[in-house]
């Protein structure tokens, strides 16, 4: 019987599938951070349980760690300091490997998992974070879980899960100039909506997806949850294997050859059926900018801010009216005329070396607009080190960007990097909800190249018409 990629991974991890009850899945890798783990560890302690598989549990600090070097030594925020200290104590007590603030391996959990080779094709991966779907770029079944589920996995290394439906989204053809992986996923969400994939696992396919680097594939899978999906997956191929080869936690020698042989079978069989399918011609995609308060409120850079009359229902009309009020925008305003105050390049969506190279290429030879505050936050220490070896930090600093230490930073208002009320930010992150980057902050989601261009011009700009200076620097 022909099977989809999802079905193969799901069935390989079934412990039990009783009738009329959730299935029980074995979990290969549990990623842990400081925010959603303290109560779970306390639950183990109170019930006298041990951590079932410390060898399949890895922790880091990322969500509320400061990104200014001096502030990382003594963390001023009381809640953040308590959470980080609790993670240190818990990892020491339960035997969990922790990549702490000063560790070379520290970084955003969804950046370090792949770069260390912890993430592998065919795995089941969970984390107490919505954007765990990032790891699906490797052909893993990866999804976020709540704190009670974190404790369940810690205690049993298994998790009850209802079987989701399958949804294949194929992007076919060559991507137009200036269109990136971020634009692919924003374009998808714009088409199907923020609930368009609720109850599904998405498999991304098609020639445009296959042409992406692993960094690009991670960006696409990262935002699957923003379309309502439980997870997003891409079949592993030679691009995947080349990325994983020789990484710290990847198999070596004969074990590598055996792993690649097994991973090569993780693809949807010809004739396998999906519950739903969508084909998008790549030529229809464009650089996008979100204008509202969810990722589905997105338009091409050349469009105008929509008005309530464009809504398909009364509920949607009210949503547009509320979003326009919160965002301080008027219908009919060209997106390219919307001025910004802050630029944030970072997050688990777009903080990898490829993202920083793309942004640096845009800003080379330019200066940040005098009215804009701009920062670049690498996703991990290793990304930061690589960028500094390539001189990207110098390019950003000379242009007027702040060059920060690794962490989740301005993606969410849980650390010192926040917007003030009314500030408007061009952000490479994944969510633009009300208050996401700080109370009253206004978030617009864009690609790294689009964010970099906005930092220079002071407003949203079409990257397709950008005049690049000094491309040879990054050749």
Swiss-Prot record:
Cofactor note (record): Binds 1 [4Fe-4S] cluster per subunit.
Keywords: 4Fe-4S, Amino-acid biosynthesis, Branched-chain amino acid biosynthesis, Iron, Iron-sulfur, Leucine biosynthesis, Lyase, Metal-binding
Enzyme's top EC category: lyase
Binding site for [4Fe-4S] cluster: 348, 408, 411
Molecular function via GO: 3-isopropylmalate dehydratase activity; 4 iron, 4 sulfur cluster binding; metal ion binding
Requisite cofactors: [4Fe-4S] cluster
Biological process annotations from GO: L-leucine biosynthetic process
Pathway this chain belongs to: Amino-acid biosynthesis; L-leucine biosynthesis; L-leucine from 3-methyl-2-oxobutanoate: step 2/4
The keyword RNA-binding belongs to this UniProt entry's keyword annotation: no
UniProt cross-references to Gene3D superfamilies, sorted A to Z: Aconitase, domain 3
Keyword Lyase set for record: yes
Domain of life, source organism: Bacteria
A Pfam entry, by short name: Aconitase
SUPFAM superfamilies the UniProt entry points to: Aconitase iron-sulfur domain
UniProt-listed Enzyme Commission number(s): 4.2.1.33
Catalytic activities: (2R,3S)-3-isopropylmalate = (2S)-2-isopropylmalate
Family per similarity comment: Belongs to the aconitase/IPM isomerase family. LeuC type 1 subfamily.
Subunit structure, interactors included: Heterodimer of LeuC and LeuD.
Matches recorded under HAMAP family: LeuC_type1 (MF_01026)
Purpose: Catalyzes the isomerization between 2-isopropylmalate and 3-isopropylmalate, via the formation of 2-isopropylmaleate.
Protein's recorded name: 3-isopropylmalate dehydratase large subunit
